[in-house]
Amino acid sequence: ETETADLNLDAARITLNKRYNLNLTNEQIIIMASIIEREALTDDDRPKVASVFYNRLYDDMYLQSDATLAYSLGREATAEDLSSMTSDPYNTYAFKGLTPTPICSPGYASIKAAMDPAATNYYYFWITSDEHVFSETYEEHQQAIENARERESASKQ
């Protein structure tokens, strides 16, 4: 039996579309999996990263994925790139919804996470050097960033 035996996209799509009031196609689930693949540090974090992006889609927010920008640019994005890439459909800071195509070939764990995200109220995450910090509100997110930067700064002294 292969790992893919339990990857029933059709069943997952029906569940996701009900849970998040979306009208996703199987291809869009794979697009989501590709974004998760590039954003998550560990397999354990993938369902939580998925929940962030699905929660944002549900609430008609921008995905704001750095990974989609990096895919389009072929390198890490800068703040300047954000303002100059306003017509790029891979700029999920400027375009709502998913990218037109996958941004990589997602692995099994990312596909599973895209099919069955964690049930959270997370809308934000920050990646430190070794972990994700998830937040429910923008204020919590800003505090998490500040805390992470303070820890990194203290560890360099």
Roles of regions detected by a PLM:
Residues 1-157:
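Bacterial extracytoplasmic/cell-wall-associated proteins, especially those involved in peptidoglycan
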